[in-house]
Amino acid sequence: MSHEKSFLVSGDSYPPPNPGYPVGPQAPMPPYVQPPYPGAPYPQAAFQPSPYGQPGYPHGPGPYPQGGYPQGPYPQGGYPQGPYPQSPFPPNPYGQPPPFQDPGSPQHGNYQEEGPPSYYDNQDFPSVNWDKSIRQAFIRKVFLVLTLQLSVTLSTVAIFTFVGEVKGFVRANVWTYYVSYAIFFISLIVLSCCGDFRRKHPWNLVALSILTISLSYMVGMIASFYNTEAVIMAVGITTAVCFTVVIFSMQTRYDFTSCMGVLLVSVVVLFIFAILCIFIRNRILEIVYASLGALLFTCFLAVDTQLLLGNKQLSLSPEEYVFAALNLYTDIINIFLYILTIIGRAKE
């Protein structure tokens, strides 16, 4: 049996020694390393090489370079060398983290904006002041026109009440009342329905003057049929009521302009009540009718005052000073006539 066959039969754990080499324990072989691709440097050792370079293996070419990376002081793995980007916020000496910066928002850290922030350019404040000044001028103009109208009416009532000749003339010529009523009605329709006309100066003031003169004549003629004491009392009560309602409408938080629909329905009911009083001549019924009329037009005075002030749901345009004066004037005249009716019927 040959030497190889005896090894297989005996079952020794070591193969037979090759000829020419001593038999005995041998030094461990270094681990097998896969050769790199052609042209690449040898793989690094298990330890980290120092910056000065370690000697390579006997079969390697000198110190080992960094595999696949350029040599240099503290190379960045896989990234190009360059200065680090600066934060948009200056460094904090106390080590606090910088505030969060939205990438889509403009950079404010370098303070390169031109001019103040946008809210300084807001033009709402001058417009608010301008609107307030316009409203105040509108209120002054309306009350000036209203004062002139009431002065004309009060003078006419005083003449028709205290001058006997005038009182006798108007009582003898009742047809003048109907003429003045027709003039008043036409001018009232024109000023109420024709918006362009009542904004056209000076024709709006001309129409308002005609309406004031015709209505003053009517009121003076009605007052001439009552005694002087009743007229003076009605003037005083009307002045007190109107002054109180105007002050209350300026101070209250309640919005009377929201009740416009209810007041219009009440006017229709009052008109039907007036037709009933024409056919049923009763003193108590006339006092009730006059009381309801005075109350209704007192509410209208409150509504028109708030429309004039413009601080509630509905308001008048500053161009409608003629229309505002017309509303207040007719409200006050109707309150005076209803109060005069109440006093006159109560004294009978």
UniProtKB/Swiss-Prot annotation:
Family of the protein in this entry: Belongs to the BI1 family. LFG subfamily.
CC annotations in GO: endoplasmic reticulum; Golgi apparatus; Golgi membrane; membrane
Role of this protein: Potential apoptotic regulator.
Taxonomic superkingdom: Eukaryota
Bilayer disposition of the protein: Multi-pass membrane protein
Region ranges (Disordered): 1-118
Pfam (any one): Bax1-I
Organism: Rattus norvegicus (Rat)
Record's keyword annotation contains Transmembrane helix: yes
Protein name: Protein lifeguard 1
Single GO BP term: negative regulation of endoplasmic reticulum stress-induced intrinsic apoptotic signaling pathway
Membrane-traversing stretches: 142-162, 174-194, 205-225, 230-250, 260-280, 284-304, 323-343
Bias kind Pro residues: ranges: 14-41, 82-101
Main location per the UniProt record: membrane
